[in-house]
Regions:
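Flexible juxtamembrane loops connecting transmembrane helices in multi-pass membrane enzymes
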Residues: 170-178, 262, 278-309, 333
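Juxtamembrane membrane-water interface segments that cap and precede transmembrane helices
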Residues: 34-35, 167-182, 305-306, 339-353
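Long extracytoplasmic/lumenal interhelical loops at the membrane interface
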Residues: 295-309, 313, 317, 321-358
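Membrane-interface micro-motifs in multi-pass membrane enzymes
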Residues: 43-52, 103-104, 179-195, 236-237, ...
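Hydrophobic transmembrane alpha-helices and their immediate junctions
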Residues: 250-253, 358-402
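Transmembrane alpha-helices of multi-pass inner-membrane enzymes
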Residues: 55-61, 242-246, 394-435
């Protein structure tokens, strides 16, 4: 039905499209706006980034309505995503704080619409995928350099980011936060988890294309960004980075295990040995890693446990439709459940947050979307003989999985800087795996 409507509008606007310089170059404008979303995400506020993303959406709608032969299609995993979005709308309608939930809904709409725009753009522009990954990699590298310099200038904490009670002075880490707004090392860590796979993916792409200088440059930037990730002190990003390395080792085994087994095992062993040595020798890093297992002995862990407990109580009382999306809406209702002194903007777990905000069935839909996408991507990676396509699919899949694992213990998943990278990776996976 939608494609029939599009065909009708395209027919009516055919003369306009053929004689409009703007419409003839609309793909170039969409590409420029997508790039601008990534570039501005490093220094601009959430509102500015969202506004630029909406420009991308507007241009895409104009393109779909006017460009001949443009069609819409919905793949299996997108049915889950569509169900999730519809349930978010139902949750919005039933929210007791509608005006606050509406703000959160507009953010969700922007992310979903940006994903739709990327899918439509990449249908006929698959050759632009390296440029999208390059833009993300460039931004990640910029943040890595900034964070590295902040470490040597010993920037002060803007708020209490680390429990220093019981730590010796040499065990206190200077936590870097880059230029992402609002300034927060956990946000920077999450951004690295989402974006660093693009650098490793580009390095592999250039290696497959026999552009060895670019491949070496990609590897160096990826390693440098990985180093800066550990300087954020974000323990969730440490776990996410472990997922990234496990994913890369698993995919590379497809090409190296049979003929280069010794080299493969040496690389894996070297990475594990280097990471272990760094944890043992660098006292501040060791203290951060060990604090993961300190349970309630660490104030940050204890805070999260209290938030989880209160969020589960919120879910029990609002399990069907949730309370409505948005951190402002969450904070208002969370106040009725929270333990004194433990205020929070979110549930510190993306799956628990979705359940609290939009209900049980929205959570099922979102998890169904992830499982279907991951399943299709893994099948493609195992069976495809196209090395470059496997690299792109693996890059997207590793980023998606790492972000979701990090999101089990943190709240930064819902920040626009990470959201736009996440949905870009989903669009790339969709384009490579499904199309």
């Amino acid at each position: 039905m939608f494609n029939k409507i599009l065909k009708f509008t395209q027919k009516k606007t055919g003369y306009l499209y053929n004689n409009s310089l703007f419409l003839q170059n609309i793909d170039k404008l969409i590409f420029a706006s997508i790039m601008l979303v990534f570039l501005t995400s490093t220094v601009m506020s959430s509102d500015v980034i969202g506004f630029i993303a909406l420009i991308t959406v507007f241009l895409t709608i104009v393109k779909v309505l006017t460009k001949p032969n443009e069609t819409l299609s919905c793949k299996s995993f997108e049915l889950w995503l569509l169900a999730y979005f519809m349930l978010v709308i139902v949750s919005l309608a039933g929210s007791t704080l509608f005006h606050l939930s509406l703000k959160g809904f507009f953010k969700t709409f922007t992310y979903m619409a940006f994903y739709f725009s990327l899918v439509q753009y990449l249908k006929n522009n698959r050759n632009k995928i390296p440029y999208l990954l390059g833009a993300i990699g460039l931004c990640v590298s910029f943040e890595a350099i900034t964070g590295f310099l902040q470490n040597f200038s010993h920037v002060e904490e803007i708020s209490g980011w680390q429990d220093v009670s019981g730590l010796n002075p040499e065990e206190v880490m200077t936590r870097v936060y880059g230029t992402l707004k609002p300034y927060n090392p956990n946000l920077l860590g999450g951004y690295f988890v989402a974006g660093i796979p693009s650098l490793y993916g580009l390095a592999a792409y250039f290696l497959a294309d026999k552009k060895y200088k670019f491949a070496i440059g990609g590897v160096l930037l990826a390693l440098f960004s990985t180093l800066t990730l550990f300087l954020t002190g974000c323990r969730g990003s440490y776990i996410g980075m472990m997922v990234v390395f496990c994913g890369m080792f698993a995919v590379s085994a497809k090409y190296l295990w049979q003929n280069y087994k010794a080299i493969y095992l040496s690389i894996v062993g070297g990475v594990v040995a280097f990471a272990t040595t760094a944890i043992l020798l660098v006292s501040s890093l060791r203290a951060r890693v060990l604090s993961i297992f300190a349970m309630r002995q660490d104030s940050s862990n204890s805070f999260r446990f209290n938030v989880y407990h209160s969020s589960v109580d919120m879910f029990k009382d609002n399990w069907l439709l949730g309370i409505g999306v948005g951190n402002q809406n969450f904070r208002e209702i969370y106040g009725l459940y929270m333990k004194t002194g433990f205020d929070a903007l979110s549930a510190y777990n993306i799956f628990l947050e979705i359940a609290v905000e939009s209900g049980l069935f929205a959570l099922i839909a979102f998890v169904g979307f992830l499982i279907t996408l991951i399943k299709n991507s893994v099948k493609f990676i195992l069976k495809s003989a196209d090395t470059k396509s496997v690299i792109f699919a693996a890059t997207a899949l590793i980023s998606i999985c790492a972000v979701c694992i990090h999101g089990l213990v943190d709240t930064v998943f819902f920040r626009p800087q990470i959201q736009f990278v996440f949905w870009t990776m989903v669009a790339i996976a969709r384009t490579i795996v499904v199309e």
